[in-house]
């Protein structure tokens, strides 16, 4: 069996991250013979961290044979440590009255 690939995903509990994680764990992204370790980053906010824990439980419940491990954190250094691939998908949606430049400034913080 191949060595696991470490995949860091930002915004892991968001809509885009959530949709990607199950595809990565099932082998749709890297192949049906490539084990993965998911390193999941979410904002240091109670609601986001609770959602991340829920996503991780769902992934565990699926018992994907290629999912060799998971780390959930709000620390970027932990999430990106030894990562082979990084998917930066966390973002804040545009709110009412926001211009694109406002959105860029807000997402830069993330």
From Swiss-Prot:
NAD(+) binds at residues 11-17, 107. Substrate binds at residues 94, 100. Its EC number is 1.1.1.37. GO terms for biological process: malate metabolic process; tricarboxylic acid cycle. Pfam families: Ldh_1_N (PF00056). GO terms for molecular function: L-malate dehydrogenase (NAD+) activity. It catalyses: (S)-malate + NAD(+) = oxaloacetate + NADH + H(+). Catalyzes the reversible oxidation of malate to oxaloacetate. This is Malate dehydrogenase. The gene is mdh.
């Amino acid at each position: 069996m191949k060595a696991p690939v470490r995949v860091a995903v930002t915004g892991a509990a968001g809509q885009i991250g959530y949709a990607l994680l199950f595809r990565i764990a099932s082998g749709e992204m890297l192949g049906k013979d490539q084990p993965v370790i998911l390193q999941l980053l979410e904002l240091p906010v109670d609601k986001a961290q609770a959602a991340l824990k829920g996503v991780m439980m769902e992934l565990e419940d699926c018992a994907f044979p290629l999912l060799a491990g998971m780390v959930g954190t709000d620390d970027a250094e932990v999430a990106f440590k030894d990562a082979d691939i990084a998917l930066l998908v966390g973002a804040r949606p545009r709110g009412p009255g926001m211009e694109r430049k406002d959105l860029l400034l807000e997402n830069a913080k993330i």
